[in-house]
Amino acid sequence: MPSIVDIAVNNEGFSTLVAAVQAAGLVETLAGEGDFTVFAPNDDAFAKLPPGTIQTLVQNPPQLARILTYHVAAGRLTKDDLIKLGEVTSIEGSPIPINGEDDFEVKNATVLAADIEADNGIIHVIDNVILMG
């Protein structure tokens, strides 16, 4: 089974995420031993950010890494697990609120595709970049 990184690299809808993970130096982490739960913003999600945001973040790898690790939780958590928990802690250290009442939402993002299995975790595709705070 492919890793989280392999799945992202081989899916055209994640080119911005892949470039950001590379710029932040997180490829080895997300390709390595898991398990991780990744809330993966697609390219459309990154396109919603204000102009210049991605370029600014790529030039600041520590800040970019902090934002990206806010999209990752330890463990292999399915949609059902996440909805039951109501909140998870990101590997960045901040809580991520989960809402499953109407749509399946992660903070300010709606999950477009849930429970994509990888050998080192699980991916949930989201429609917004989730921001801390």
From Swiss-Prot:
InterPro entries: Adhesion/Biosynth-related, FAS1_dom_sf, FAS1_domain. Residues 1-130 form the FAS1 domain. It comes from the Bacteria. Pfam families: Fasciclin. GO terms for cellular component: extracellular space. Disulfide bonds: none annotated. This is Uncharacterized protein SYNPCC7002_A0175.
